[in-house]
Every structure is written in C-alpha cells, then in structure tokens.
C-alpha cells in the first residue's frame, strides 16, 4: 500500500447500511483499496416520534468501531464522514453523532437531502459512461434522490422522504407480498413523486442511471437470469409478479437475489416502479459510483471528464504498456468497416463505441505473454476496474478479445448480455478483420478496402493485385475465411 498521505476515505452513514470506501488517486482516477459495508438498518430504529432507539444506535456505533481501525492510517483532512436521511430526521441524532465522532476521531456531517443528491450526481458523473445529459435515481433506506444534470452540472435535484426501509415498515410490515401491499406502496410513492415530476421532465435526460442497492440487486438478478442489463418497466412488473407468487417476504426467492438484499427488495421495487411510471422512464442502467465516490472526487478536486470511457482506456493502455499507435490503427480500420455495414446490419452507436474500445485494448494480453494472449486479454478485461463500462459491457469486451483470432468460441459470444448475440457476432467479425489488415503496424501498408454486408454475407474488396503481392496476407485471409465458415459466417474476399 502507498504512503498513508495518498489515501482518502469516505464514510456514508446511510439509513439501511453504513459504507466505507478507502482509495488512492491514480492518474486522474481513483483506485479502490478497501470497501466495507455493514447492514445497520438505522431507519428501522425510528419510532413514530422520530426517536432513534438505543439498539439501532448501538448497531451503528459497533459498525463504526470496525471502520475506526482503518481510519488510523489516514490523515483526518483526507476523511469525510456524512450522515443522511435517518440522522436528518432523528430528534436525538446529536447523541448518536457525538459518540460516533468520538469513535472515529473525526467530524461527522449531517448533510441536507439536496447536498446528498448533488454528491450522488458527482459520483455518477465521475464514474459512469454514456450520454452526459442524465437523470440519476438513488433509493436509499429512508430517502430517494432524483437529480438531472449535464456533464458535471446539476440542473434539478430533489430528496424525497421515501426509502426502501421506511416503505418496508409502512407497507410490508406484515411481511405479506400480496398485490394490495404493492399497490399501496406504489400509490404512496407516486404521490410523493407527483410534485417534482414536472420539473424533472422539463429538464429532460438522454440516459437514466440508478445508483442504489435496489438497482444493484436488479442488475444481479438480470445477469443471473441471462437477461440484458437494461432495466425496463416490463422487467420490473415481471419481478413484482414473481414476488407476489412467493407470497411472503421470508419465502422470497428469485434467481440472483441475495439473502442480504431480499428484505428491502420488494419495497425498493415498488418505489422504482412508481418512479418509472410517474416519470415515463423507458430504460435505466446501473451507475458506476454514487455518494461515496462523489465525496472522494470532491476531496481530490478532480474535474469531471466528458468521456469517462476514454480516460479509462488511456489509463489501462499506459498501465499495461499497450502500443497506442497500433491500437489506434486497428480502431481506425474497424471504424471504417463498421461505418460501411451499420445500415445493413442496423447497428447502434453504442456498438461502435464498444468495438473501438475492444480495439484499444486488443493487445493487452501481450503484457502477460504472446502465447495465449487472447485468453490473457479476456481475463484482464474481465477482472480490471473499468470506470464508464457496465458489468455487461466489460463481459462483452472480454469476449471479443477472447475471440480476436483463432477458431471462434460462439457460445461465449452468446453468453454475454450487453448486446444481442447476433450483434456480438458481427462486432467480433469486424474486430478480427481489422486486426488482420492492420497487422503490418504501418499506416501506409493498410490497403484501401470496401466492405459490404448482405444479411450475414460479408464481401471484402481489396485493391487489384493485392492478394498476389501479399502471399502471407493471402494465407492469413484464407485461414480467417475458414474459421469464419466453421461458425457459418460467410465471407468473400476479392
């Protein structure tokens, strides 16, 4: 571990869980060293007078004693501890905070709902790829934050008094997962949302990002069940029906839902359905970071980059000493191929971005060894922290790199869920051809080519006489033609 002065810690005393994040700054980004999360369920200790019970406070202090051990290594000026909704509400919050500060040896700041929303947005802006005009949704234990913004700037932010713990106690107190309880929870959530919905819709968004445990749980369920990672209202309604079918909270079993998340899953699901319905959200993806990341980046005073993915790719290229000129050369050829076939194949812009990203990293496996370089590349990409890329996108990149040469493993292309299997196959074909035609590692030796698609048939036209003048190239293309034919990818080269 580096010198202690390079370490930063962010602690979030949430209504459901307490979290600690310890990082160090690396090349304009952060490297995570420690993440500790403990379910404290502080909000469950609030009574009708908003008094926090002694038992709930003791659970919180016990957790902070664990955190305090790690904080001894970090300068106090590089630690931020914030408390959110439950400690905003609790009339005896001062008692809890006084002892918490004594345990941690540093100040604990109770932040407003608006400040919490702003920090969540900053965490998302620093760690999440895609369009920069976004709506961010975070459902915590006792509050829900909704923020619109562009780039680093928020345009509207709201903190609403509803959360997965408070809605659990209010609408699922009998642990019954019947339609009536869901209807009541959703109706109440929609009433809370209605006063702010118009302003949020007025500011608008191109992408919607979820930054909470509920959204994380949904992502895990979808990955476990082989669905794509995009959260839609249809999928939420299907999961609600599955929960209703289970009958009771203690009997809730859904593939991919952990026991730890199950208790507050139905209440969080009801709130999320209300948000989708009231704001007419088409699709949501998981954020790369939220409140804790916002705190850390705030301490580091790092500017928000417009393109998180580009920063990530640059950092990885430097770290693994990838030949950047060659990566760019392959990317240029792949982009040219993509642009020629995108209309026939009905490819989306995100597919182009992911293909170019695969090109930028395709030689990363050489940093381990030439032998089995594609396998090494796939392993590294699957396991590296790649801010800006979702888990499913990381899996797709790893799968493309695994299949960049040699016989194609079709099943691996079908097991990823970032894009439809057919699109993954098409991106793989373009990547393989781009690598072949940039293999001489000189711009002036990349031939002028046209690529046409007719359904699955690819027709590649080279300059006249090129195959005769390049016998090794001709042999490599013949081998590639054979490998593609094994998986029924027709390729004609003229």
Swiss-Prot record:
Question: Some GO term, biological process aspect, for this entry: which one?
Answer: nucleobase-containing small molecule interconversion
Q: Which pathway does the UniProt entry assign to this protein?
A: Purine metabolism; ppGpp biosynthesis; ppGpp from GTP: step 2/2
Q: Which domain of life is it from?
A: Bacteria
The family database entries (Pfam families) matched by this protein are listed as: Ppx-GppA, Ppx-GppA_III
Reaction(s) catalysed by this chain's protein = guanosine 3'-diphosphate 5'-triphosphate + H2O = guanosine 3',5'-bis(diphosphate) + phosphate + H(+)
Q: Which UniProt keywords apply?
A: Hydrolase
EC number(s) on record? Answer: 3.6.1.40
Q: Which SUPFAM superfamilies match?
A: Actin-like ATPase domain, HD-domain/PDEase-like
Q: What terms describe the molecular function in GO for this protein?
A: guanosine-5'-triphosphate,3'-diphosphate diphosphatase activity
- Top-rank EC class of the record's enzyme: hydrolase
Q: Does the keyword DNA-binding apply?
A: no
UniProt cross-references to NCBIfam families, sorted A to Z? PRK11031.1
Main role? Catalyzes the conversion of pppGpp to ppGpp. Guanosine pentaphosphate (pppGpp) is a cytoplasmic signaling molecule which together with ppGpp controls the 'stringent response', an adaptive process that allows bacteria to respond to amino acid starvation, resulting in the coordinated regulation of numerous cellular activities.
Q: Which family does it belong to?
A: Belongs to the GppA/Ppx family. GppA subfamily.
Q: What is this protein called?
A: Guanosine-5'-triphosphate,3'-diphosphate pyrophosphatase
Organism name? Shigella flexneri serotype 5b (strain 8401)
């Amino acid at each position: 571990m580096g010198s202690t002065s390079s370490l930063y810690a962010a602690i979030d005393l949430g209504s459901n869980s307490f979290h600690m994040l310890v990082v160090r700054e690396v090349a304009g980004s952060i490297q995570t060293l420690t993440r500790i999360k403990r379910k404290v369920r502080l909000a469950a200790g609030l009574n009708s007078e908003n008094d926090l019970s002694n038992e709930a406070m003791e659970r919180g202090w016990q957790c902070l004693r664990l955190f305090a051990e790690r904080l001894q290594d970090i300068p106090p000026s590089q630690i931020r501890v914030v408390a959110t909704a439950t400690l905003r509400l609790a009339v005896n919050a001062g008692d809890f905070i006084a002892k918490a500060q004594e345990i941690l040896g540093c100040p604990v700041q109770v932040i407003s709902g608006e400040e919490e929303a702003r920090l969540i947005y900053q965490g998302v802006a620093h760690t999440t790829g895609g369009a920069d005009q976004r709506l961010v949704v975070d459902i915590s234990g006792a509050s829900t934050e909704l923020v619109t913004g562009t780039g680093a700037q928020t345009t509207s932010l709201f903190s609403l008094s509803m959360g997965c713990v408070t809605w659990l106690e209010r609408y699922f107190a009998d642990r019954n997962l019947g339609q009536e309880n869901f209807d009541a929870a959703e109706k109440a959530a929609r009433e809370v949302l209605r006063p702010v919905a118009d302003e949020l819709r007025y500011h608008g968004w191109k992408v919607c990002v979820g930054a909470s445990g509920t959204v994380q749980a949904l992502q895990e369920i979808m990955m476990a069940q082989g669905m794509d990672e995009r959260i839609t209202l249809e999928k939420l309604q299907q999961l609600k029906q599955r929960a209703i079918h289970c009958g009771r909270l203690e009997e809730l079993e859904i593939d991919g839902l952990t026991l730890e998340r199950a208790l507050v899953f139905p209440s969080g699901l009801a709130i999320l359905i209300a948000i989708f319905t009231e704001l007419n959200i088409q699709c949501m993806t998981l954020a790369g970071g939220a409140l804790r990341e916002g705190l850390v980046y705030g301490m580091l005073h790092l500017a928000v980059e417009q393109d998180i993915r580009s920063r990530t790719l640059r950092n990885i290229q430097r770290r693994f000493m990838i030949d950047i000129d060659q990566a760019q050369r392959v990317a240029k050829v792949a982009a040219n191929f993509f642009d020629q076939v995108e209309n026939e194949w009905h490819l989306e812009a995100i597919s182009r971005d992911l293909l170019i990203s695969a090109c930028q990293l395709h030689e990363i496996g050489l940093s381990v060894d030439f032998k089995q370089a594609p396998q090494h590349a796939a392993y590294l990409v699957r396991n590296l922290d790649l801010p800006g890329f979702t888990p499913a996108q990381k899996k797709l990149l790893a799968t493309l790199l695994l299949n960049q040469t040699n016989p194609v493993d079709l099943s691996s292309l079908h097991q990823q869920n970032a894009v439809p299997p057919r699109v993954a196959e098409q991106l793989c074909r373009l990547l393989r051809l781009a690598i072949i035609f940039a293999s001489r590692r000189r711009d002036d030796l990349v031939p002028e080519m046209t690529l046409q698609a007719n359904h699955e048939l690819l027709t590649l036209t080279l300059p006249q006489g090129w195959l005769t003048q390049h016998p090794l190239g001709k042999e490599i293309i013949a081998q590639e033609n054979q490998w593609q034919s094994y998986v029924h990818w027709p390729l004609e080269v003229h």
